[in-house]
Amino acid sequence: MKITMQIKLQPTKEETVLLDFTMQEYISLVNDILDYAIASDIMPKLTSKTMIAPLPSALKAQCYMDAKSIYGNTLKHKSRMPVLKKPVAIWNNQNYTIDDGYVAFPLFVNNKTTKTKISAVVPQRVLDIAATHKLGTLRITKKGNKYIAQIAYETAESAAKTSGNVMGVDLGIKCPAVAVTNNGKTKFYGNGRQNKQKRRKFAAKRKRLGKAKKLKAIKKSHNKEQRWMADQDHKISRAIVNDAIANDVKTIKLEELSGIRQSARTSRKNNHSLHSWSFYRLAKFIEYKAGLAGIEVVYVNPAYTSQICPCCGKRNHANDRNYVCSCGYHTHRDRLGAVNILTA
């Protein structure tokens, strides 16, 4: 399984100029190679010597590989040839090093290639991974005014468990996730009300900024909200998988992603929250973390999971947060969904 870790760079003012220049020249060279390939209807054979650009040879070679990959994929899928715009530069794993406090890679300085150490926040976890795993490419990108180093590495998934318990997980708005295991354990994850209040603050701030026509500030606020949402999903998915491991779970059952928005229970005032929160992202976070632990993830049909009584099969509508069936069964409505997913 391929995983990408991120490192926040802390370049000096002079180094930010170098990074901006390098990233712009990188995408310009890739676009130039693609333009040539389109015009001649064939991918040209180029070397770092024949590619004219103020970039280190390693970066030129990577530019050619990227252009070749884009050109081949575009022909294969018969799609429109893209034009790269987002600043980025990529180094292969032989041309960079990571150490405590910095990331070093070649840059073109004063008309010559110089391996440059850029100050960075490098967590111990990243150093441990670098020492024990084969690293892939280094990708430098810019998000707002921040420079991020993205490093890919391969890790083996744990062998799939052949025996163990089953966990059903229901995703929602008021309660982000509820998990029920076949050994009788139930747990609620996240705080939907707190999430809603937090996102209302983001929306109110953007409304004020909109009236002041501060477009850059609006975009910054939106990006900050998205990062916060992703962080919440990471924490919830980690907690779910940790509990699955603790309960010897071999299979986690989730709702099919295509129907989750239709089946989710919500009021009109929660419609915005429903359609802006990414159930897909949370499900995928659970899936990849579970895969690393050797836990299988299965998707089930979500139809009527919030209405069917697991005891008698009768369909009922919950009253507020309580679900009561005429057969005598009663439970929390969010837990009901997880129970029905578990037994689906």
Enumerate the language-model features and the residues they cover.
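Nucleic-acid substrate recognition interfaces
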Residues: 1-344
